[in-house]
Every structure is written in C-alpha cells, then in structure tokens.
Amino acid sequence: MSGQPIPDEALGRIGERVILAGRQMDDPATEFELMTALGMLYFQEAKCDLVVLEVGLGGRLDSTNVIPAPEVAVITNIGLEHVEQLGDTHAKIAGEKAGIIKPGCD
C-alpha cells in the first residue's frame, strides 16, 4: 500500500484468517484467490480511500471480480494469453475480460 508491502504482523494475522476460511470451503481456493482475499481484508482494515486491483486472469471468472460496484474498470489490451482458460480468439478473450465491467462502472 502506497508503495510499501503489507507489514509482516498484518500479513501473518490476516493470513491466518484467510487460511482458516479457506479450509472451510467445499472447493479449495487457489493461491491467487487466497492472496486476493488477504489483500482485500488488509485494504479494508487500513480504511483505504482508493484501491487499484489488477485482474490476474481475464475478468469474468477472476477472483478480483467480487467487487460489487467498482467505480472504474480498464482493459489495457486483448492478446492471445491464457487461451486454455479464456478462449482461443481475440473475440472470446475480449468477452472474458469484459466480464469485469459491471453496471454503473466507468
């Protein structure tokens, strides 16, 4: 946050909460999902005014897509990446990436 990593104390404390919650899930969470949850809990605890999240995989199915009403969504490029998960054409990948955009989002 503000160019600084999450302090070790907060990382350990929040990490324990995330790991315990993850163990209660029917489907195991991915490492990216666990790290996303940890970051979001830290940002909430720190009462951040603004948080910029980078989508890790596409958009529609990405773990960052839990934000109910983001103010802004930006798609920087549509390349043939993660084709196994997103599709093998630019159109399919664009559709997956557009899944991060929600009503009312600029």
For each predicted feature, which ranges?
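ATP-dependent carboxylate-amine ligase catalytic core
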Residues: M1-P68, L80-A94
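Catalytic subdomain that performs nucleotidyl-dependent activation
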Residues: H90-G104
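Conserved beta-strand/loop subsegment of P-loop NTPase cores
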Residues: V72-G79, I101-D106
